[in-house]
């Protein structure tokens, strides 16, 4: 386990720490996926989904390099940082990660992530309703 094991379960996170953690898109994707799953997740599963979102494709459409790049950065950098902040429980030896109780403190800082890409919907709606002049 990471040094996050030494933190109290409900330690109050500072805004500076929250902003530092959330400034990276890969970490935001990680937190979103873990929240969706609401269970311990294997690192390989997490890496595949994050890579798919980053590359705007499906898990099946990923290349080996895309998978490996995300897996490596999650393993070496992002999950240890989230664990040290007390936001996830990360067992590096088993390759399993899940949200900790402190993750709830991030709710007000994260934009809601819907399954539907609303920006594309609104763009399509605007294009179809625009009248030519």
Named regions from a protein language model:
Residues 1-26, 30, 46, 90, ...:
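Haloarchaeal acidic low-complexity proteome signature biased toward cell-envelope/secretome components but also
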Residues 21, 33-37, 49, 53:
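Short amphipathic alpha-helical elements of helix-turn-helix/winged-helix folds
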Residues 39, 93-95:
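Beta-strand-connecting loop/turn residues
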Residues 41-50, 56-66:
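Short acidic, hydrophobic short linear motifs in intrinsically disordered regions
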Residues 65, 95-99:
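Glycine-rich loop motifs involved in handling phospho/adenylate chemistry
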Residues 67-78:
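Charge-enriched amphipathic alpha-helical scaffolds
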Residues 79-93:
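A short, conserved structural fragment
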């Amino acid at each position: 386990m990471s040094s996050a094991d030494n933190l109290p379960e409900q330690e109050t996170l500072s805004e500076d720490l929250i902003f530092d953690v959330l400034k990276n898109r890969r970490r935001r994707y990680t937190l979103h996926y873990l929240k969706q799953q609401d269970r311990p997740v294997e690192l390989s599963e997490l890496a595949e989904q994050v890579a798919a979102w980053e590359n705007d494709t499906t898990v099946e459409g990923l290349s080996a390099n895309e998978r490996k790049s995300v897996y490596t950065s999650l393993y070496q950098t992002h999950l240890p940082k989230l664990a040290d902040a007390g936001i996830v429980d990360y067992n590096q030896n088993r390759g399993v990660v899940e949200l900790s109780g402190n993750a709830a403190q991030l709710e007000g800082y994260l934009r809601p992530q819907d399954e539907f890409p609303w920006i594309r919907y609104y763009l399509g709606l605007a294009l179809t309703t625009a009248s030519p002049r």
